[in-house]
Regions:
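Conserved ABC ATPase "signature" region
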Residues: 109-127, 180
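ABC ATPase "signature
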Residues: 217-218, 226
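Helix-to-loop junction immediately C-terminal to a conserved catalytic motif
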Residues: 48
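A short, proline-enriched helix->beta-strand linker immediately N-terminal to the Walker B motif
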Residues: 151-155
Length: 232
């Protein structure tokens, strides 16, 4: 589904990814953890073409991202970040259906039904559809962000510390929601976090990164019972 082949990336004199190789099979929930600046976000953004390798290749569904129409690619991949990225002047319903609308789906009734269905999928009631982002709590906004990512019928979901700003109770609820959604929709999820407990709870596998390289890749149990080195 997603493959990195000998990827190198630098910003100025700083090497961010170094001969990076990784394969993420379809339907896997991969959590990624590491210190700030280790290359996590750069790696994630290469999947949807927001960053390009200096050398090597990134493939999504066997297609080289560098040779793919990026608008089409990005509309097919859900992307959720910590600050939700919702448009404040749009209702929740309009936010959720933004990608389908700009992709040509103009039927208002159909889009409304899609928004309501996705609200229910992420655990929010129908009456939220006509509210604006500023009328929602942080946890509710994050759920709407996930619903919007799902609206394009994406099979891949990229998440960059999506729950980092939430309180612990809301964070745990969202984690459980994501586990349920992933099982229900069989999505491929790449999820960056600074929270080791979150990484262990959510990931089928956990990728530990350090200085642009893979320090260890394995199941939560493998990471806990057989750490590769003192850093891990």
């Amino acid at each position: 589904m997603i493959r990195f082949e000998h990827v190198n990336k630098s910003f100025g004199n700083e090497q961010v990814l170094i001969d990076f190789n990784l394969e993420i099979p379809e339907g896997e929930f991969l959590t990624v953890i590491g210190r700030s600046g280790c290359g996590k976000t750069t790696m994630l953004r290469m999947i949807n073409g927001l960053h390009t390798p200096d050398s090597g290749r990134v493939l999504v569904q066997e297609k080289n991202v560098a040779e793919t129409d990026l608008i089409t690619l990005r509309r097919s991949i859900g992307y959720v970040i910590q600050n939700k990225g919702l448009f404040p002047h749009m209702t929740v319903s309009e936010n959720i259906t933004y990608v389908p609308v700009i992709s040509g789906k103009k039927d208002k009734l159909e889009n409304r039904r899609l928004a309501v269905r996705l609200l229910k999928t992420v655990g929010l009631p129908e009456e939220m559809a006509d509210r604006y982002p500023l009328e929602l709590s942080g946890g509710q906004q994050q759920r709407v962000g996930i619903a919007r990512a799902l609206a394009a019928d994406a099979k891949i979901l990229l998440m960059d510390e999506p729950f980092g700003a939430l309180d612990e109770i809301t964070k745990r609820a969202m984690q459980n929601e994501m586990l349920s959604l992933q099982k229900q929709l069989h999505m491929t999820i790449v999820f960056i976090t600074h929270d080791i407990q979150e990484a262990m709870k959510l990931g089928d596998r956990v990728l530990v990164m350090e200085k642009g390289r893979i320090a260890q890749l394995g199941t939560p149990r493998e990471i806990q019972e057989h750490p590769a080195d003192d850093f891990v």
